[in-house]
Amino acid sequence: MGQKVNPHGLRVGVIKGWDAKWYANKKNFADNLIEDNKIRKFVKKELFSAGISKIEIERAAKRVKLNIYTAKPGVIIGKGGSGIEALKNKLTQFVENKNVLINIVEVKSAEADAQLMAENIAAQLEKRISFRRAMKQTMQRAMKHGIKGVKTACSGRLGGAEIARTEHYHEGTIPLQTLRADIDYGFAEADTTYGKIGVKVWVYNGEVLPTKKVEKEEANA
C-alpha cells in the first residue's frame, strides 16, 4: 500500500496537515475547490522561477490567505513588496469580492525538498541531460543536507527509447509503509521531444513521534 499511494495523502491526520484549510457547505464546496485549483496552477506558472514547493490555502468568510513555500522569497516579494501587490491584483480574477492575503514562507534547504528536487530533475531532462546523471547528482546533493534517505523515479521514453520504462534510484532508507515516518513527496513532468517524462521524488526526514506519546513519556520521567 505504501509503495502505491501518495505519501502525503496517506499521512494526513496522522503527522501531516491539509494543504487546503477551509470548510464549505455543499452549495459552495465545488466552487471553492475549482477556485483553489485555478489559484495553485496560476501561482505555480507565474512564479515558476521562484521555486514553489507548496501552496496552502486558508479561507474565512471574506478572506483568502495563501501560504506560499518558496526557495527564493526575494523573487516573489520584489522591491518594497511590489511583487506581492502585483500578485494580489492578478489573483482578483479568480477570487471575487474577497480580500487576498499572501504569506511567504522560505524553504531553508531547497536541495532536500522533494517537490523542488523533482522540478530540478525535470528541468535537466528538458535540457537533454542524461536522466541517470540528473537523478544521481540531485540525490547526492540532498543527502549532504542530513536527510535519512531519498528515492527518485523517472518514467517515460527515457533517452528517446522506443519503449517507455521506469527507472528507480535510491540512497539511505525510505520506509513508505511506516505512518510516523516523515516522507516528503514531489512530482514533476518534463516535456521532451520524445514526449512527457514523469519524475517522482521521495525524501525521508526521520520519524515524527505523536505528541501524546511524547507528553506521556515526559510525565512519567
Curated annotation (Swiss-Prot):
Molecular-function GO term, any one: rRNA binding
InterPro entries, alphabetized: KH_dom, KH_dom-like_a/b, KH_dom_type_2, KH_sf_prok-type, Ribosomal_S3_C_sf, Ribosomal_uS3_bac-typ, Ribosomal_uS3_C, Ribosomal_uS3_CS
SUPFAM superfamilies: Prokaryotic type KH domain (KH-domain type II), Ribosomal protein S3 C-terminal domain
Transmembrane segments: none
Keyword rRNA-binding on entry: yes
Any Gene Ontology biological process: translation
Pfam families with a match to the protein in the record: KH_2 (PF07650), Ribosomal_S3_C (PF00189)
UniProt entry keywords in alphabetical sequence: Ribonucleoprotein, Ribosomal protein, RNA-binding, rRNA-binding
Sequence ranges assigned to domain KH type-2 in this UniProt record: 39-108
Cellular component annotations (GO), alphabetically ordered: cytosolic small ribosomal subunit
Subunit architecture: Part of the 30S ribosomal subunit. Forms a tight complex with proteins S10 and S14.
Family: Belongs to the universal ribosomal protein uS3 family.
Function: Binds the lower part of the 30S subunit head. Binds mRNA in the 70S ribosome, positioning it for translation.
Record's protein name: Small ribosomal subunit protein uS3
Gene: rpsC
